[in-house]
Curated annotation (Swiss-Prot):
Tagged with keyword ATP-binding: yes
Native organism: Roseobacter denitrificans (strain ATCC 33942 / OCh 114)
Xref: CDD domains: RecA-like_ClpX (cd19497)
Protein name: ATP-dependent Clp protease ATP-binding subunit ClpX
NCBIfam families named in the record: clpX, PRK05342.1
Positions of the ClpX-type ZB domain: 3-56
Amino acid sequence: MATNSSGDGKNTLYCSFCGKSQHEVRKLIAGPTVFICDECVELCMDIIREETKASGLKATDGVPTPKDICAVLDDYVIGQAMAKRVLSVAVHNHYKRLNHAQKGGDIELAKSNILLIGPTGCGKTLLAQTLARILDVPFTMADATTLTEAGYVGEDVENIILKLLQSSEYNVERAQRGIVYIDEVDKITRKSENPSITRDVSGEGVQQALLKLMEGTVASVPPQGGRKHPQQEFLQVDTTNILFICGGAFAGLDKIIAARGKGSAMGFGADVRGNDDRGVGEIFTDLEPEDLLKFGLIPEFVGRLPVLATLEDLDEDALVTILTQPKNALVKQYQRLFELEDTELTFTDDALSAIAKRAIERKTGARGLRSILEDILLDTMFDLPGLESVTEVVVNEEAVNSDAAPLMIHADASKEPASAG
């Protein structure tokens, strides 16, 4: 123990680290058999702060290469090779730009926000979620359809940054390097190509409100939400280094692109072209910024999304792969459900192809696969818990394309159609 008996019989206490007495410091904190003074506490805090800052810089220096990012995306997202390449390069350059800004330099690198365009169910949201997981940065998703201008009923755009803060546990420094994914951005287009003379608070008004946020501004964010707690202190968040990814299905944009490609010639010498029978995703590859303006995005908004990544329709092979290959594939999920009933669930190759074809016909992409499987297996899942000796359920092409029930294999190996309650 750091004590010393003086001549007058009183014990003087000393700091166990620097050796100063209790009379030389403002505060001496006692621990089990040791003491530490306020000066040593401050010194320790400075050391920890510096080491934390240094380790943080090292972590941000190690940005994965575009090939590494693309390889991880391949593990989670089926197909979309071109979109993955565009995203991998854009994200790598974004975080390289942040490291460049930390080190200082004469040339300031501009931010490149990303616009993902593709049919519904093709993997736009999953790509953004996977990117955030790879980079280990705060990530939040916002639905553009719920946003309105400040002062109107609905969500303010600042709430997007509040969600990002919440995902970073209110660590402002970390949130300022995060990723924001704004879904359904095609639903906030203005109603006509010409500027509106009336207020459009959920369309063009939201685009205007998002401009500064996406370009870079210091946003005043209410930690508890702005409208219910008007007296609270605001947090200041700089959005300059936040990467914004916007996504949408843009239904009808393919017709605008196709019309631009056709032209409108008339007469005997006109170049008459047939109907464009390409898929929506293929047509999107010919996208130009002017097409987005015709669709209803304002020029300033398009200008703040310089990186365009178009996603293709998922073909039959891709949908079959989605059904069977990923770690949490739908087929594996239903097989696990049947295992809980001590029954094996199998799908024939023809059945998987038929399920994929039906999803393509519905134009729902990968998102519609679960509802198709539910339709096929509903009666079987209803009857199975009350049946005994069923060891296997086989889904064949007939069960997918007609009202026939999947086959049930009993312990005696005889096959019979499943009875629909």
